[in-house]
Design a protein with these regions (language model features):
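Generic protein-terminus/edge-of-domain signal
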Residues: 1-66, 73, 105-121
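Short, Lys/Arg-enriched, Trp-marked, Pro/Gly-tolerant hinge/linker segments that flank
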Residues: 119-129, 144-157, 163-198
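Short acidic (Asp/Glu) patches
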Residues: 71-77
Length: 198
């Protein structure tokens, strides 16, 4: 999709003040510990055999699924088959940057808004819409790591376009949380409630 991939970087902090994009393709990856961070994350799952847990919901990932993860949301990757190639594109966006590029009429954080009726972390776009979103991400990735004249401006423009399309998709296609994680006897839900209250 993006032409080239990069080795998986386990860091969970942004180096940039704005946004970062990654294209990972690897096998023999272990489960990732439950974690959170202070930026927005958009995760496009391309291939593999994984589940993703976000705030107590377990999502059985299918190729083309998009996960929207807000700052401070607890999430975890669960690898079901280590020998299977696992490919994904990950976009990190600083909240201040996303607010800065939004307008009063169109907040680009809306797709992450938990208070919106029908909010979900998982989006499953149709084939045509997915193709468009993948194309935008591919171009953004090439520009972000490119060195041609104006590549930073081009990448930022593609980020704007991607976020507008992502918000349109989120507003048009709500999906309910597929599986509540109950293996902990409700402990995770209690911890999340405590964190949200404090």
């Amino acid at each position: 999709m993006c032409g080239r991939t990069q080795p998986f970087d386990p860091r969970q902090q942004m180096k940039s003040q704005g946004y970062e994009i990654f294209h990972y393709k690897d096998s023999q990856l272990d489960n990732v510990a439950v974690h959170h961070h202070d930026f927005f994350e958009v995760y496009l799952f391309l291939s593999g055999n994984v589940d993703y847990s976000v705030e107590g919901c377990i999502y059985h990932m299918e190729g083309g699924d998009l996960l929207l993860i807000s700052p401070q949301e607890l999430h975890q990757l669960k690898v079901n088959a280590k020998e299977t190639m696992y490919e994904r594109i990950v976009l990190w966006i600083a909240p201040a940057y996303l607010s800065k590029i939004s307008t009063a009429e169109a907040s680009l954080t809306r797709c992450f808004d938990h208070s919106r009726p029908g909010h979900t972390n998982l989006l499953r776009p149709g084939k045509n819409r997915l193709g468009g979103l993948r194309g935008i991400l591919s171009e953004m990735y090439q520009e972000f790591y490119g060195n041609e004249y104006g590549h930073e401006i081009a990448a930022s423009g593609l980020l704007l376009r991607f976020m507008v399309e992502l918000n349109r998709l989120a507003l048009a296609q709500p999906v309910a949380c597929p599986d509540q994680e109950d293996r902990s006897g409700g402990f995770i839900q209690q911890v999340l409630a405590y964190i949200n209250d404090h």
